[in-house]
Amino acid sequence: MYFRFGKGLQIQLRHSSKAVRSQLRWNSTTKLIKPIASTQHPFLVKPVTPHESYVSCTIFNEKGDVTAVSHKFPKWEFLQKYGLYPRDLRKIDSSTIDVIPSFVIKPKCILVNVLHIKAMIQKDKVFVFDTTNPDAAIKLGVLMYDLESKLSQRNINYQGKSVSYQENYEHRALESILINVMTCLETEYKYHHSVCGMILNDLENQIDRDKLRDLLIKSKTLTAFAQKSVLLRDLLDELLESDEDLAGMYLSEKKHPDADDHSDLEMLLETYYKQCDEYVQQSESLIQDIKSTEEIVNIILDANRNSLLLFELKVTVYTLGFTVATLVPAFYGMNLKNFIEDSNWGFASVVGLSVAAAAVVTITNMRALRSVTKLTLLNNHTGANNKKHLANAKLALDKEIPTFWDRWLTSARVLWSGREVLYKDGSKRDMIWKWLVDDDKK
């Protein structure tokens, strides 16, 4: 039974197709890449050796069957056959994995360069270019399996009825690529979240040097992942904003660049745009948690270092007081007459004088140390009540604000001597000049 359906049903069909793909299992009779058969990795693609004169790719036909595995094309012949330019080879070069993703819209094809996937989509064929990276080759194997099941899909069961799948061939291939990319991003984010979350939880219990080093290393890889996700999200956003690119991505049925009927493709791209944006927000939130933890750790380390310095200063102050206390008895310990040998109060007076001198020195230094440790937002000097330190912000402000009696005396002086008396003080003239200069700068 074949009939057309609306936008809401298209979304349900897209989710149903994902469920069908997730229920598929590998079968030994399934036709796929021959050199990669294995019990553990049934669809593992092997990396290839790059060649300067050839491009290597796996080809899918319009039915989703693999027609060629690692087929080599001479580069110049490949460019002429499919109407490409030499600069387009940079997008499909298998030697490197580009950080910046791109979709190049051509009249007869779409060049896809997203993370580990380099592909060319036509209206009835898909070319997946081989890679030299072993890790990327494993991910490409999963893409091959998904492409085969997605491109060969014709009908789907909906409420007990067989419904024809009306999505274009190139859009199904594009969706398979985006699904593979989002799956890789999700897997990578879960890895970063588990590792970084474990380190952050350990740092809450104990600050360790090795854990801080591991956190620094993991934060760098997490930042690279966030940058990669942001670039992909921006790419999808640019596609959604450009009607010309959306119209050019219809290869089976050509549409005019000014046409506005791109609802099915817009829904497809918007779905994966939101998913990619979610990974961006989660990764940025995790990066912010790491930065907050680093700041808290730095504050704790600074506080501990200050406590050690303060303890050392206190020990020094007490040592100085003890030294002063032993200095006076040392003088009386010399073999010289000091005229108090026969006094009944000599010993008590020397001991009392030594203790008093030690107490005075210790108390004075401890007060100075206490004033140093009292830091405020307005003032952090060592003597807020001394004339030497009139830079205290609160006292200086109170000094400059005139009281009622100050204003009354100023008015009386103006009436008696004239307004010239207000500017005889050089410090006030300098202050007024500074205010004027600051106002001009503002």
Curated annotation (Swiss-Prot):
**Metal-binding listed as a keyword:** no
What residue range is the signal peptide? none
Q: Spell out the Pfam families in the cross-references.
A: MRS2-like
Q: Where in the cell is it found?
A: Mitochondrion inner membrane
Heme: is it a keyword of this entry? no
Q: Which UniProt keywords apply?
A: Ion transport, Magnesium, Membrane, Mitochondrion, Mitochondrion inner membrane, Transit peptide, Transmembrane, Transmembrane helix, Transport
Query: Which GO terms label this protein's molecular function in UniProt?
Result: magnesium ion transmembrane transporter activity
**What topology does it adopt in the membrane?**
Multi-pass membrane protein
Q: Which GO terms describe its cellular component?
A: mitochondrial inner membrane
Which domain of life does the protein's organism represent?
Eukaryota
Chief localisation class: mitochondrion
Q: From the record, which residues define motif YGMN? A: 332-335
For this entry, the transit peptide stretch runs 1-15
Name the SUPFAM superfamilies for this protein.
Magnesium transport protein CorA, transmembrane region
Q: Where are the transmembrane segments?
A: 308-328, 344-364
According to its UniProt entry, the protein's GO biological process terms are: mitochondrial magnesium ion transmembrane transport
Cited PANTHER family = MAGNESIUM TRANSPORTER MRS2, MITOCHONDRIAL, RNA SPLICING PROTEIN MRS2, MITOCHONDRIAL
Tell me the subunit arrangement: Homopentamer. Forms homooligomers. Interacts with MFM1.
Q: What does this protein do?
A: High-conductance magnesium-selective channel that mediates the influx of magnesium into the mitochondrial matrix. Essential for the splicing of mRNA group II introns in mitochondria by affecting mitochondrial magnesium concentrations, which are critical for group II intron splicing. It also suppresses a variety of mitochondrial intron mutations and its absence may disturb the assembly of mitochondrial membrane complexes.
Q: Which family does it belong to?
A: Belongs to the CorA metal ion transporter (MIT) (TC 1.A.35) family.
Q: What is this protein called?
A: Mitochondrial inner membrane magnesium transporter MRS2
Gene of origin? MRS2
